[in-house]
């Protein structure tokens, strides 16, 4: 909103915003409802939402905030440089970032051998899980994937982590896990699991570690896409961008509550340490 206003689009003056939120199984219906509002552009979070919106709103420009996995491989763009069609946005390439988070977790706790991964149900996160399995094999770590698609499934998910004797947790890249970060961080703490998450604000809400792009920078880029489309540029002519800056955050308060000692290298490499 502030970035759109800075670029000349102010809600109530020359901009009308419609928002829809829901669990994964509700997304197609929400996308159809949104299309009935006749938007000029739709901002969609994650590949599955982009697919749903593309199907429900066949004539509307779409800005992905963000593609989780490769939009070219999934047939949503001809190339990153020139996507063609009506979809553009930010490609997170989450599979590489999720595998990197497993690396960071292992570097922080090098003796751990059993790691849980909190994931959505297939087909969500499949590319990330495949990349993480390859990383786990290289590290000599046993990976247990636990699936949950809504808050009511979190408690049983953490029970399964306990049953698997997990020693740490990777919360996979997903918008709903970001939304529920405080709930997940509390559950991880109750289970005695050091957790690494996606965004800085997830560490601020209680995850032990986070590693990912700088959200504020990405949102400015998403706003720039929206403005260019509203001013007449076809989305297919706007290159799909990938993040270029990443940050690592450590929550020492969470470390203290878990009773874990963080190695100096983890603290030295962190862009921010929450005391």
Language model feature labels by segment:
Residues 1-275:
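Short hydrophobic alpha-helices and adjacent helix-cap/hinge residues
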